[in-house]
Amino acid sequence: MIEHAEVLQRGDDSGNEMLVRFRLPSGLEIFGLPTKNFYGGHWDLGPTWNYAVLSDRPFLVDAGRFGQGKKLVAMLEKIGITAADLDFVLISHGHEDHDGGLAELVDATCLNVKAHAIYGRLIKTYPAKSPTADKKDFPAKCWHCPMPETFYTQNCLEYHNVLQGLKIDPIGNGANEIGPDIRTAHLPGHSPDCLAVRLGDEAIIVGDIILPDISPWPTRKSLFNEVAAVIDPPYTDAAAIFGLRCYIRSLKKLIKIASDAPGLLVLPAHRFYYHGRWNPVDLENRAKELLAHHIARCGAIIDILKNGAKTAEEIAAAHFEKDLLEGYGSIMAANEIVSHCELLIESGDVVAVNGNAYAATGSMQFETDIQEEI
């Protein structure tokens, strides 16, 4: 059981349908409201944990995936919270399982929306700036989606369309903060707009930046080139908001936060309750585990390349378990490999060859670079 947690309604073994109250020593109450995802199999995330924070300015963090907005309103009402009780909804980052229900939620509640400034730019369409013709009707945040056209046309177009009219109040980087004891931290890498919400020295809502049980998916640094036209200026440095190295810096910032405020209750967006048990997160230890995970993956990639140059898909096939490569899993795995190869290229341990393949150089500088990254 998680300290300070009171289960108000039990759900299934993944946490779906649960209602949980966290009452902190200061008296601050936070409600965990997990909404369903359609993902399954070996890439299953479990539900998205949205949180209602009953501070001086009560607010909601995240809105679940597409179609879950009204469900989230019903969950709030079940614990005695109405739209009139909330000041705004804050989006931790612009992935569909976090903002998919946003438009429906806003339509039902008229809540103001806060998110990082990058989010506000990426949810808009820019037909003249789209990198490919098939993406001109999709917002900029969809331009870098690795899924095939058949997937995003069938599953994503309506979701993207309903976000277009939303007004986003930018928050983060010290701008428009919630209060003296409630601050956001911009921690990109998994997504360029990732925010964590620190609730004094008692708790931190981390979205997908750090998760129990599974490792968050790092972006590729090269994705910056596809959206630079709509976020530059002021975001001119790809390494500041995209890529594995960026994600590693965010993990180290979380380690610093944990050092400054030991004992923080960590409220993640997935796998908080899974397989019928709680998965508590020690912020410092989990961040260090994830750093070690990425160091090990870089080493594994170099070992695979000792037998000759390979594409990202070939490296993924050699590195990941076969069942993780089924369906769209192969695309996700290849993206993961590319993000690591980008870092290995910067460290001088790997070079790009033949357009789409990678070869080892014989050096092993990456671990030193990761450990020294600030």
PLM feature spans:
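Short Pro/Gly-enriched beta-strand edge/turn motifs at strand-loop
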Residues: I2, G27-F38, T153-C156, E177-I182
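C-terminal regulatory/interaction regions
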Residues: I2-V7, D12-G15, G299-I374
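Conserved beta-strand hairpin/beta-sheet module of binuclear metal-dependent hydrolase folds
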Residues: E17-A83, A196-D213
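Residues at alpha-helix caps and immediate loop-helix transition turns in enzyme cores, especially N-
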Residues: L45, K71-L72, G101, D282-R286
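Divalent metal-coordination and catalytic microenvironments
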Residues: V53, D62, L72, H93, ...
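Active-site HxH/HxHxD metal-binding segment of metal-dependent hydrolases
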Residues: R65-K70, E77-I178, I210-P212
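Metallo-beta-lactamase
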Residues: G67, D181-K288, A292, C298
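Aromatic/hydrophobic pocket-lining residues that form the small-molecule binding cavity
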Residues: D99, Y247, L251, I337
